[in-house]
A protein has these predicted regions:
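Helicase motor core with emphasis on the C-terminal RecA-like subdomain
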Residues: 1-283, 287-294
């Protein structure tokens, strides 16, 4: 959205986009419910004005309010919405959820831990899989798990990598290519590998700690068995006792296909003002026309 708004800030942008035929918005569920999603809505309203025959495609993972997501993307009461078609996959993805829990519950912490007490159990999962993605919720947790795995199991050197947003782009691309070429046994990562990734060799996912949402859990599970009729396998590792309840809830939600809604932003005046200022740097606008456009 940011790059698109910069293009709209350029002089004579209407000439650039006048011949635009289609816009494909990938991973719409990630933008929906954020101010970046509002940026995308505003940019699309401009593109629809500049190109009367514009076609808009939205691609989304499973969310609870898919109809509302379509309405927000295309614009309420718009011709694009009236003439739109919603396509859903009929194939039911098989997802196998397994929990990694300690043998002795008496020593299991109740809060504030990183899950490292179950590191040996995770190594067992890694050894029995072709390639494993180990998802953590923070960069610091990602780095700690990576360091501890190499310290306790130095034989993984050269077969274990780390991937998160603070690592250089060149290194991230190298890791992604190494996964595709099946030269890595495991990758410890964050949400940086949530989206836009198709790694056929990945057999197993490990989620360290609560994923903070069923949709994200399913998204990460789908990184494994990423082919039609293949089974996705994900191991959930609770870092403390309270997350045992979350493990039970996740299994139930996956079984019942219960996914939370992504609530869109309303009345984001700060984003609107920023957008209007962007337009003033290009060719400007008339109040009445921009009101109807938005």
């Amino acid at each position: 959205p940011e790059s698109l708004q910069l293009l709209l800030a350029s002089k004579k942008h209407h000439q650039i986009f006048a011949s635009l035929n289609a816009v494909v918005v990938d991973e719409w569920h990630e933008l929906l419910g954020s101010k970046r999603g509002v940026q995308m809505e505003l940019a699309l309203s401009r593109l629809k004005t500049l190109s009367s025959s514009l076609k808009i495609w939205g691609i989304s993972a499973t969310i609870g309010n898919l109809e509302q997501a379509r309405e927000v993307l295309l614009g309420p009461q718009s011709n694009h919405l009236k003439n739109s078609v919603l396509i859903k996959a009929r194939l039911k993805k098989k997802i196998k959820v397994q929990s990694i829990i300690p043998k002795s519950m008496e020593k299991f912490p109740w809060r504030g831990h990183l899950g490292l007490q179950l590191l040996d159990e995770v190594v067992g999962v890694i050894r029995h899989s072709k390639t494993t993605l180990i998802f953590t919720n923070t960069r610091s947790q990602c780095e700690l798990w990576f360091q501890q795995l190499l310290e306790r199991y130095p034989e993984f050197a050269g077969e274990l990598a780390m991937h998160h947003g603070s690592i250089s782009k060149a290194t991230r691309l190298w890791v992604e290519q190494a996964i595709r070429e099946e030269t890595l046994k495991a990758v410890v990562c964050t949400s940086s590998l949530d989206l836009g990734v198709d790694f056929a060799p990945v057999e197993t996912i490990v989620q360290i700690g609560g994923p903070k949402g069923v949709a994200r859990f399913l998204q990460r599970a789908g990184r494994s068995g990423h082919q039609p009729r293949e089974t996705s396998v994900i191991h959930f590792l609770p870092t403390h006792g309270i997350e045992l309840i979350e493990a039970s809830a996740l299994k139930k939600a996956v079984k019942n296909q219960a996914v939370e809604n992504r609530i869109p932003y309303f009345l984001s005046y700060d984003v609107l003002i920023q957008y209007l200022i962007t337009l003033t740097f290009s060719d400007g606008f008339y109040p009445e026309s921009i009101f109807n456009e938005i």
